[in-house]
Amino acid sequence: MATVQPIVNSHLSELDEDVFHHFGFTTKSFDFKEKFGDVKFVCVCGSSGRIHNFAISMAKLAGLALPVENIAGSHARFVLYKVDHILFADHGMGIPSALIMLHEVTKLLHYAGCKDVLFIRLGTSGGLGVKPGTIVLSDRCVNTKLEPYNELCILGKPVRRQTIVDLNTVNELKKLSENLSLECSVVVGGTIAANDFYEEQGRLDGSICTFSKEEKLAFLQSAYEHGIRNMEMEGTAITSHCYLTGHRAILVCVTAVNRLEGDQITISTDEFTLFAQRPGQLVGEYLKRNNGIIVR
């Protein structure tokens, strides 16, 4: 399991009805154990459209009829789909948005009685020393200080939560990738999760920039030498929150740019769409082989 003694919020037992505001339902909307009790995997990504497409692809692979039902309410912030033993949700952009999703999905799993669920983030990222279109399997996730923590401020006090990646699954995915005919390289390396797309990632093209090109390159080169191979904006939230709540987490992200060569994403829209599908190709095969779906 991810952690020996997962944290459970004791205040939840005092609620007559728990409102999942960002998913548009409550604990009285349906029987959570009946509806979600068999969940073994949760797949998440930033885009609602991309996670919907991935859910559709897994439903087709399972031989299920379409469309895939969005379980979330009509005015919900996030979407939620279920195909056999897999939940699919979007998390928006950045750590704050991802944490909202994580709180509500891990509460859902708690009410459903699900334990040791594997969370898989399928995303896009900026690469470090790898060409665009490369899949990076994260062997660790750090903040921009290259520390393996997600940092929060709770009741005015700083809190650091350790990030933990499920290395067994990372190694399984790497071995699996070597036996598939993927049209890209798959590398294992560290991931930086930043609080911003521009300044915290050392970009020179934001509306504010207080550092030189030389300082930027020194930072990125140092990160590369420490084994970092990509940068995104949610990983520390996912890998720390899942660990604390008794679940496992991995990050599977494709790169859209090599940050050692430039800041802006210059690949075409068609290329970006193609690259963004690559994590799903690898993860989909993994889920099929590990009983995430029931092939009919």
Curated annotation (Swiss-Prot):
Record organism: Schistosoma mansoni (Blood fluke)
Lineage: Eukaryota, Metazoa, Spiralia, Lophotrochozoa, Platyhelminthes
The name this protein goes by in its record: Uridine phosphorylase A
Keyword Glycosyltransferase applies: yes
Pathway entry: Pyrimidine metabolism; UMP biosynthesis via salvage pathway; uracil from uridine (phosphorylase route): step 1/1
Gene coding for it: UPPA
Subunit: Homodimer.
Positions annotated to bind uridine: S125, G126, Q201, G202, R203
GO molecular function: identical protein binding; uridine phosphorylase activity
Pfam families: PNP_UDP_1 (PF01048)
Record: residues binding phosphate: G46, R77, R121, L122, G123, T124
Highest taxon above the source species: Eukaryota
